[in-house]
Amino acid sequence: AILAGIVLDTKSFTLRTGDRTFDAAAYLRRAGADTVAVKKLMQNGMEQTVAKYKILQRAQLYRSMAVAVPETPQNRIVAAQAADELLNVAGVDASMVMYPTEDGGVFVSARSIGDVNVQLIMEKLGGGGNRAAAAAQINGLTLKQAVEKLYAAIDEYIDS
């Protein structure tokens, strides 16, 4: 379970990873941690996998950022995983998945690698988080209006 937590927290040893992270993982492996069990623990069901790839099909590039806007409510975990997956696309510095919620609001999950600080972009939408992972809940706007506000926030972030 500890090795699974390290893999999850570091996004498979790609973020917030230093010598001590690898030392801890090596220690756990020597102590019998099962890497196959960790992989199986991280697997999604078929329904979640299909939902994630449907979100990915909606992605478009905007100023070196991948923005996916499915028009139906989404599972927040699946949407966050889709945002993570979009970072695997060459040339993408940040990603956002924006979708309507069941209660009439709009939610956006944002991820980044490198220099883009998605926290600053999400703060412009009333949300927050940290440099690499942030989110916002937007009320009182349609999905189309929220997308326009997101693009304006991206423009303001890049142009400032």
Task: Identify the residue ranges that each predicted region occupies.
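Hydrophobic helix-and-loop "lid/oligomerization" segment in the mid-to-C-terminal part
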Residues: 3, 8-124, 129-160
